[in-house]
Amino acid sequence: MQEESANDMECEQLPAEILRQVTVHRDPIYGFGFVAGSERPVVVRSVRPGGPSENKLLAGDQIVAINEEDVSEAPRERLIELIRSAKEFIVLTVLHTHQSPKSAFISAAKKAKLRSNPVKVRFSEQVAVGETDAKMMKKEALLLIPNVLKVFLENGQIKSFTFDGRTTVKDVMLTLQDRLSLRFIEHFALVLEYAGPEQNHKFLLLQDKQPLAYVVQRTHYHGMKCLFRISFFPKDPVELLRRDPAAFEYLYIQSRNDVIRERFGMDPKPEMLLGLAALHIYITVSATRPSQKISLKNVEKEWGLEPFLPPSLLQVIKEKNLRKSLSQQLKAHQTHPSCGTKGSAIQAKLQYLRILNELPTFTGVLFNTVGLDEKQSATTLLVGPRHGISHVIDLKTNLTTVLSEFSKISKIQLFRENQGVARVETSIMDAKPLVLLMEWPEATNFACLIAGYCRLLLDSRKMVFSRPASQPLPPPMIKADYMHSAHRPVTGGHLGKKESSYVGSVGTSPRKSSRCTPPPADSELVSFCYLHMREQRKEQESRTDVNENLIFFEETRPRTKSDPTSKSSGQGYEVVPDDFDAASLDHEPCASRARSYTLDNSLGAEALNFYCDSCKAKLQEQLGPRKGGKPGSSRDNIVDLMSLPPPGSEEEEEEEDETTSLLPAIAAPPPGFRDNSSDEDDPKRRAVQSQEQGRHLRGLLYDEIPVTLIDSVQTRTVRDHAQELDDALVSTLQALEALAASEDGPHPPPPQTAGLIVLATITPESSLDSGHETNSSELTDMSEMMSAMKQHQNTTYFLAQHLNKDSLLARKDLPFRIQSCAAQAVLTAPYSLGRPDPNPSLQPIATGQSPGPPGARRKLPQSEGQVQGERTYSLAVHPALSPQLSEQKNLSLLSPVPEDKGPGHTRAGLEMSLRAATSSLSEEQVSELRDNLPKEVRLSPKLILDPKSSVTPAIISAALQQVVHNKSLVTAGGALGNPPSRGERRLEASMGRPEVSMMSSSASKNLKFKISPSAPETSWNSQHQLGAEVSSSPRAPTGSRADSLHLSQQEDSLPVQNFPPKSYLLRTSRESVGKQATGEVAGKGGPVGGKPTLQKQGTISSQGEKAQLESTPKRSKLEETSLVPRATYPMALQSPSCQSRSHSPSCQPHGHSPSSQSRGQSPSCQPRGQSPLRSQAASRQVSTMPSRKLETTLNGAHSTSEGPAKPKSSRGPFRLRNLFSATFPTRQKKETDERQAQLQKVKQYELEFLEELLKPPSQGELPGTEYLQPPAPGRCSCQLRSSPVQQGPGMSREQRRSCDCKRICRGGRPQATQTPVPSLRGRERDRVLPSQRQPEAGPGVSLSSPINVQRIRSTSLESRECRSDPESGVSCLTTCASGGECLGAPNYRKLMRRYSISELDQGDRASLTSDVYPHPPLGMLPREAKEVEASLPIALGPKSRSLESPTLGDPSYVQVAPETKGPRQMAVFSLPEEVYRKPAELDEDSESSKCCSIRYCFYYRKCDMADDASDGKDELSYSIPMKILPGMKLDEQVVPVVSRTLQVLDAATCSSSSPEASRTQEIDLRVSTFEGSLAKINALRAHAYGLPDGFLAARLDTNELLTVLRQCVASPEARAPKPYVSQISEYKLELALKFKELRASCRRVANVDKSPTHMLAAITGSFQVLSSLIETFVRLVFIVRSEAQRQELLAKVEEVVRNYTFLLRAAEESTARNLNQQQQQQQQQQQQQQQQQQQQQQQQQQQVAAAAGAATEHPPGSPTSATVMSTFTHSLKTLIK
């Protein structure tokens, strides 16, 4: 008999040339029911539908025998005679010959059937898509194009199907059945293939009734394939051969592929694989060369052996033995044992399948249960046709126990037990139900498999898999959810679909959910939300929770905004019940969502975080009137942007419209592209398509096109936010307002939070979107997000999820991208966003409005409304900061504010008061202020409200928020372009006071008191003047501007959202103070003049909020284009910091005295850092920092006026990343408590280590104790000591650690020892007063002192002394500035570089100069350095200023802040302890510290780097003093690189806490390949390190290794089949040896001579060992099968690499210290010769050394190396274990 062709299946044919016997009974009507042709042999032309031959004979069958009589050569007449002679039945032996693909399967009857009942799926191979990729079909993806599903057949074909919302899995299977002429489709199923953790391949069964839209929705279609497989096997292959030869042939091909691709759960024996390979060769050659003798040599020549053998077999068996065995078996097959003839191909295939059938895992599927405890341990179950449900005792010996047969199963139900775990209850007749706990993906597959076997073996209509009625209804759909479910028919799903669809979809029809379809407008909203949320979805994907981890496909699938948890997918498929739909329709027309079940009940609250309240409100508003209308199917609305609007019924068309709106333009296929059956839908679809295209374009703009914020939109959003405080979501406007307000008001979160919210509201959407509608919707989205946050009290999570830091705000292409630092700061707001405003009644006051309904606010002019919105925000934000200030100073300040009803008056009064206070303040007063400040600080941390005082912390907070908000509003809306409107001014004024008070609690106290009297007028004037001054005379008003800048910066930083007003107030107050102090009036420029300056400068602080407000739109645009991206978002969120920062650079200007600079910078930096960080820390830090800033601002104003200030574009104080970092919660969501504790320990370790490194060799080298302690006016002795450099008198590390001040700082404003601070401040102020710059610095120190305390507390590494000057955060601020950059979007960092690039560079240089450079490269003379040390106030000149300011602001800046007090001021390095603490704590601890904190910076840096590598290089994230080694030249380029490296390294440490970072890594690291990784490692290993940049290179290379680590684990190759399993043990052993070797090499590094050459040689050797270790790790990762094991290995190795980075730092610092000591000895000798001059130089050098090489001052035997080594050794030991 003729053998079948090898290519039969390849041509989409059922097996050809297969003989089969068919018994056909004569029918009285149809006879035998087929028409035969006249060919010889006779061919069946057609089969009569409904006749007896249907499903027995096929068109094209050759009749070979009739009743066992051969008629192949008989004449036609004989054939007819035989047929007629058969009376009742006839037995035909027919041969199905190979025919053309088309004619073989479409008979006339079938065509008629198709016409009458067309299938809902059409093949679309001929469809031409624009610019299609020739390889598109072969790519392993679920979708070919948006609504075209690719199905991979086992015969090598790829079929593509267009689908709409009605198309189900069953439709696709029926179409394939027709195409492949399959009889029993019950054996088949569509499955999704993905790489499982333990197995190379896992298949997720799709239920028949599952709509394809859900499948696509719930699947990450980039990483999965849809396969058409036989999933329900026959008990014996012979049965299938008899019943359905085509299915038998398909089973053979599938099994053959499984063997070659090693898809089995267990490894078959090599002998079995050899036998199967021989059969495979025999079958293939027999089919293609029927008459040829089969020899192995011929096979090798023609095909080679690879196509027939699994890869692992080639490695396990020697080639010689393999050939020998194959040859023997081929000979045996060619000689039949019984008759000696050659066996047929059919027999060989049957034998092939029977051999496989003996493997339990071939026909059966293994399921692992979840063990709860020792009593109930995990078990393994086997489900298969021959095993039923069996318990596996020993898989190797096939020892199993049957638990139940399929015939006894009556019902299967799934219940959600807990996250990711389902309880499977299988009801068994006459026995107790079988209750199992499984992970959701396993559980759904388990239930589907059993249900399929019951249908196959028992009753095809039997449904055993059902969802329990008792199961809770899915949570009501939230807007985001709704958006996804309803609007993204194609896209929303994740692989979880398998679980969810299986679980819920069996009994219900997906259409129910479709009844409530939002109108197309909604879809627009949704599209916006979708765009907004898509980033979040991606981040969530990368961030896997328990459920997600379980569902790998889900993990990969793009997350829908509405579907935060893929795990819920288990239920997700189920449709909402009718009653539920009705209820949901009442509340929210679109509330019902088919996917609602995908949300875990436990996750419901969390899910809310993903919904945009504004969008929800908008939807409600739009849908409300239409409630009566015909509901559309929301189910189909869930479409990805990439998905096409599926053709559908009228019911679905409405949804589709919405859906299509979300789809890209490409989504809409041309009219002929779709299914024929859907042609009637084309007209409507076309309309939808046009909308869809628009939406898509909008989405593209949002995602890819930098767009400036739209003023009107932003303004509207802010105003809406404010309004929302009072109103629930009712109308679109109300919803928007409510969202904003709820974000602000409901959660009187720290100002940062409010600022963050505003930013989120404005930036993500408005900036991205090009249309006002979209913007508003986007803003609404943000508002909704905020509302959700409010509801769930999880700001961090909300922000992180909703505004994907990386995705949206930090994206390179996002002009207004915000840095993570800012985001963290915002998120870490002391108060949760959801928290109600402490004193709602005060809000109106702060707002400048009488409390009234939101409507009243709405009525206000835009600017006023904005102001009000900002005010509201300020209230929300300010509470954290203002409590102390407001309580202490704001009371007086605010009380006047209410009195000053004129908006301008309040603010003006504030400014005036500040100015007057500043100018009039005596040193004693300053001291008093400083003294008071600590108290305020203490209060602020707690946000104390004074019931008696009209101004409460809440009011202050509100004021700050409002200010920020106003600024943001102003920034957002150009409407505020004019000087702030009365409302605005009033807001600013009223707010300004609180803000000022908050900003500098101590300073503001006095200032406020004094300001109150004259606040109204002065405030008003100074506002205008300030604005003018800032813009018109950056230099002249520099002092005043700097002052106001500082204030505003702080304010800005605190209430980022309220930024503009707050900044303005601060600036105004500063200006007033500065003007009075300086005698300069800011009036020169005029508010309008100031605006342009602000825009250009990118600094909005001095000019005033209005300038910023006015210029914000422009500026935001500018920023968008350039640095503004950050600024844009910051403008609202960041603008305060930007403004303050810019002003700080421009006003505060680097030119100011060092103190002023540092302070100015601090303010600017701090504001930046603060705003993001302050949101959290603001509450406690704000008062400390603010008060200091106020003083600083006041003094600074003088100094500023003295020296010109360079306007510099300031960086947004907030960076979403920072905010996120600040919002540790996001991290926490990913981390277990244990992990967090470990992180804390690691950070503390690092901190202590760095601290030790930074410790001076001896106290003698340290500045005087007075210098050390007094330096920080608000510092606690512990804090003073905390700075390694200023370790003079002090406390032990333990004492410092336990010091209350730290707690205070963390909790709220640090209560640094106030007494010392006042004295310090007094001194500083005295110094500052003598020279305006100095005064500024002094006040800055004083004001910053509390902040410093915070920072100090937060960073023991940071030199408190230096910081005291810039307490606002000279070093921290600088870092902050850098942190601000960090906070700002990575772009911001780039753009901002926050000063002009030159300035930034200078800043870097300056920081290096002070910290790192023995000689300030900036041209800072030793004298200047000294002056800076002595009193930052000393004017270094504009250049110095800018340098210094930038230094302070520069993220990369290593700040060496000399204490103004000590004659030999020590340079202080800001190394935040916070780094070691959790981000939230850090943020709270110190605004500047946050920025400076290693951890924060790293966080930010890391994000930044992920966003923009070049940006990351620009800044030093790790503020560590570096001593320049001989021959080493550090310039502004190198410093940022080093900084970035440090940040990256530390970021790695924080990566677990930075969802953004991890997500970014996942995205960036997925391209790694095995060979590429090894090549990279080998290239790095070849590096040798020497002077001058060896340490830097080593760090960079170590960072590269970290990248390689993550890339490997994230690489798809790592999850591909692992053939080298046998080598795992070898690699593991090798890895352990490498760990030991590394430990030894690291010890050598610690013990080597501290000379640079020897140290670098030791480091080179240790790095080579580390590279070898990483190489071994990579090799191991690529062969380890378990994802869990890979992650565990990664964690261990990562820990070692991170510790190694600390060792490098310690080595560098130790070496630098050694050199520094030598230099110091020489200097001492020179000092003897020239005591005075050399003393000064030594001070300068010491400062530089301290800042840049503080670590270098420790003796070689310092505990640094020991500490590092102990940590390192400990980690290595752990790893080796």
Curated annotation (Swiss-Prot):
InterPro entries: Band_41_domain, FAK1-like_FERM_C, FERM/acyl-CoA-bd_prot_sf, FERM_2, FERM_central, FERM_domain, FRMPD1/3/4_FERM_C, PDZ
Record's protein name: FERM and PDZ domain-containing protein 3
Domain PDZ: 21-98
Positions of region (Disordered): 491-520, 555-574, 622-697, 832-871, 1014-1216, 1309-1346, 1732-1765
Signal peptide: none
Composition bias, Basic and acidic residues: 555-564
Domain FERM: 147-461
Residue ranges, compositional bias (Acidic residues): 649-659
Ranges annotated as biased composition (Low complexity): 1134-1168, 1732-1751
Organism (species): Homo sapiens
Cross-referenced Pfam families: FERM_C_FAK1, FERM_M, PDZ
Biased composition (Polar residues): 502-511, 840-850, 1015-1035, 1046-1056, 1094-1111, 1172-1202
GO CC field: cytoskeleton; plasma membrane; secretory granule membrane; tertiary granule membrane
